[in-house]
Amino acid sequence: VTYYEESEKNVLRHIGYHRIEGFLQDSWKLAPRLTVDGGVRVAWIGPADDLEGRGIVVWDKARYDPQAPPSAVSGMTWHAIDPSVPTTGVRMPVFVTPRVGFAWDVAGTGVTVVRGGFGVYRYPDAPQFYGSMIDLAYGVRYFSTCCATSLRELEGLGTGEVIFGGQAVDKADDQQPRTLSWSLTLDRKLPWSTSLEIGYVGSKSDHQMNWWLDQYNAVPLGAMLDDPFGDANDYRPLPNYGNLYINRHSAYQNYHALQALLSRQRGRVNFTAAYTFSKNLGLKGADYNGYRANASEYAFDPREYNYGVLGTDRTHVASLSWSLQLPDVKRGGAWRALLGNWQLAGVSSYVSGAPLMGSFGIQGTTAGGAPISNEAITGSPDVYAMPVLVCDPRDSVPDGYLFNPACFTAPLPGANGSARQPYIKGQPYHNHDLSLAKNVPIGKGRRRLQIRVSAYNVFNHPIRFPDTTRNLTLVFDNGVQTNADFGKLPDDNKYGRRIVQLSARFEF
């Protein structure tokens, strides 16, 4: 038995929040060709609240006593034991969020228009993420013990220690998530009833919750190198706590994009072509598919370890939708009924591959025979073992692979790989849909029967995906990488097929 934990009760996690907002906005025509919009929103966005009344648990470092027993949960407080603490745990100020925009008709003819704007937006966290932060206030305690490898040792463990190893909010946190957004766009009318729109769009989101970076009681780097199989709690800075997750609004991200749109919505030929070139960077905390190098923004510099391309980044996104009304047949009778009123339409899309860095796994033994684990390589369960790169895996990629697997080598105890890994992308997505429709007039008026055949993924192009265990896991045997499928794009793990649909619709 290396670890055993038991919770003594279940709790009704009745979490919600309160929100009061008001706004003012107006529009001014400052000149015949210039219009400006402005406004301000004043909001009180309450933090997550325990609607049953005992309160969200708060971490107050000033109340922490290292000499107190673990069962005293020193440093923790909540409304039921200290009425000065609100049931929300923390208090929020009133937020003022301005926004402004403009439109400038350059020549006064409507042919060329420049638009831009800036705005600040506040919003609450989802309440369901706060459920475990009330457990302590309702008497939940955990029995936790470690570590027995034989029956004799198991008998000698005793009853264990009642500890708190959960979540709480930081007393000093008085923020709600914020996004600053701005844009500048040029609209231009072109010949053939076509319009072009090209612009820059940017945003910065800060005061984001530090999910997955909230380990407050992290084992220091290197502390367990000489004792990789020991109890991590013996090495934590706060000895009367285990894993301790203190949440605050300290994460951030930013987005920058060049966006273009070309469209024609008139006559027999209609189309819309859109393209976005973008980059999404930030702290890789709760970011899906983000490559986190450690679990603590408190113990380690988050900018050094966890800042980079987010899992939501897609460098290129392009789409084309179009429709073509085929020319009418001039001859009447059966020829017109057979060959007239046909419509052809299609949609094509392309999306760059998703970042793969966060999907990598590493296991096995080093060149010296040491097990590859966080404790053995970095000396801390809270700093993740990473491969050592000897070249850029985006160069000299073998056919059928997503990256060059020869660039990855095993780390050594005290010599971990870099926290900043190259931006490796997965397989791009592209798809084409096509439809052909025949409109048959019935009698007089607007009555008609439309018969349509549609083919989705018309070229029957499958999208292959790497399997995490087989294709994205490094397996080392005494420092030698033995997984021959690492980095390979498999032929048998693919999705997508052509779908043909027939439909009839009567309009009247």
Task: Please describe what each predicted stretch is.
Residues 1-107, 290-293:
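Signature of Gram-negative outer-membrane beta-barrel scaffolds
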